[in-house]
């Protein structure tokens, strides 16, 4: 393992993404007095890297969690696909991850996110048996068919577990298309995105936006306007009562 490379990459991404975006989210949470909330799924491996090379990132996440407006999700410690190979190993990794979250942040995850949103109904039943109240999954067209990802579902064979699906179109508009000058909708503004989100949610329960955190500052550099976009987005989204 190349410790120097690990350290260099972590410091670069912390400087470009984690620290400035966490600071922005903290500012927005305080500004909107509890109306703006976010969730994070942080693997144990990432937490290990933060502690080793950029402990200030851990502290910035602690400040966010302390607001009561940030939820930390459960996942496998090593961001692995253990469930597909060994249910026992899967349970051990998830328990280890939750213990780490509790030790660092003083909260117990209640919602599960499998690596890369990989999902099947067997996973859902296992997650329900482990005591979680919801599981996240990809809102894949070939699975949904005519259905919309903008509703809360209950997985087959589960009694209580809620299934929350990613709206990949709206998520990818930010994560992948935001700075693409060839995209017909470029530039993406907060007002434009808000219109799309409200239109998509006209007959739905919710809209789940899931994306890599490195979207902000690393994949989409600060010079693209991604931070300014995110700073403006809550205000225009929250203009609609009840949203």
Description of each model-found segment:
Residues 1-111, 117-173, 179, 187-204, ...:
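Catalytic alpha-helical scaffold of carbohydrate-active enzymes acting on polysaccharides/glycoconjugates
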Residues 207-220, 224:
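Polyanion-engaging groove/track-forming segments
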């Amino acid at each position: 393992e190349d410790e120097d490379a690990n350290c260099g990459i972590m410091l670069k991404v912390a400087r470009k993404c984690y620290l400035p975006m966490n600071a922005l989210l903290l500012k927005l949470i305080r500004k909107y007095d509890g109306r703006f909330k976010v969730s994070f799924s942080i693997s144990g491996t990432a937490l290990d890297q933060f502690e080793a090379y950029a402990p200030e990132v851990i502290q910035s996440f602690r400040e966010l969690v302390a607001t009561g407006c940030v939820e930390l999700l459960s996942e496998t410690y090593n961001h692995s696909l253990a469930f597909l190979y060994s249910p026992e190993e899967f349970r051990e990794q998830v328990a280890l991850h939750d213990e780490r979250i509790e030790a660092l942040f003083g909260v117990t995850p209640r919602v599960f996110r499998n690596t890369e949103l990989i999902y099947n109904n067997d996973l859902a039943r296992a997650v329900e048996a482990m005591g979680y109240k919801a599981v996240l999954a990809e809102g894949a067209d070939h699975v949904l068919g005519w259905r919309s990802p903008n509703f809360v579902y209950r997985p087959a064979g589960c009694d209580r577990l809620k299934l929350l699906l990613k709206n990949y179109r709206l998520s990818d508009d930010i994560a992948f298309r935001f700075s693409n000058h060839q995209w017909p909708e470029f530039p993406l503004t907060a007002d434009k995105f808000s219109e799309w989100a409200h239109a998509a949610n006209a007959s739905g329960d919710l809209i789940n936006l899931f994306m890599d955190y490195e979207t902000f500052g690393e994949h989409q550099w600060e010079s693209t306007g991604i931070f300014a976009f995110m700073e403006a987005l809550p205000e225009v989204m929250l203009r609609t009562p009840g949203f």
